[in-house]
A protein has these predicted regions:
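Short, charged recognition helix plus adjacent turn
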Residues: 70-99, 152-169
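DNA major-groove recognition helix of helix-turn-helix/homeodomain DNA-binding modules
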Residues: 52-70
Length: 169
């Protein structure tokens, strides 16, 4: 690898390449379809990457989180609808999931009361929003677990064939 950059505020694509200890030239060879000049412009935020480039980087840099980062922060549709997922340790993911599920268990009867008549009355809105937010936290935790699993697979920590055997049954 060439010299390591001492630049501050490196973007996620710059950090992903550097974590692989690749120069832009070597990264370009690995990525096959992205020239070094384009990599530099993406890393220096002079150019927005295309979605297909993100897919290639995520695969070749072994960073599935790059797809979520792109969707949540750079795609105009994703910025509105896709929450950014932060990679966490499995124990933290599980504890957050259990906390949210326990909270929802307590709120389940209230959700039934609110939705029984098919409409949300004024005095039900606050509880409904709280429940909706808790469900969103569960959804984010599920996505975090999925992303964690993908990362473990690409890094060889989970046997991909065995994982897919059970996932696809």
């Amino acid at each position: 690898m060439g010299r390591v950059s001492n630049k501050e505020n490196k973007n996620v694509y710059f950090e992903a390449r550097e974590s692989m200890k690749l120069s832009r030239e070597k990264a370009s060879e690995l990525l096959e379809s992205i020239p070094p000049e384009r990599i530099e412009r993406i890393e220096n935020e002079k150019l927005m990457p295309h979605p297909d480039e993100i897919l290639i980087m995520a695969e070749k840099y072994k960073r599935p989180d790059l797809c979520n980062f792109y969707c949540a922060n750079q795609c105009s549709i994703g910025k509105q609808y896709v929450p950014e997922i932060k990679i966490k340790e499995l124990s933290q993911i599980v504890l957050e999931m259990l906390a949210s599920l326990n909270s929802m268990q307590k709120r389940k009867d209230r959700l039934i009361e609110i939705s029984a008549d098919g409409q949300i009355d004024r005095d039900e809105i606050e509880d409904f929003i709280f429940i909706q937010e808790e469900l969103e936290r569960i959804s984010i935790t599920v996505e975090t677990l999925r992303l964690w699993s993908e990362k473990m697979i690409v890094n060889g920590m989970i046997d991909e064939a065995e994982y897919m055997k059970y996932k696809n049954r």
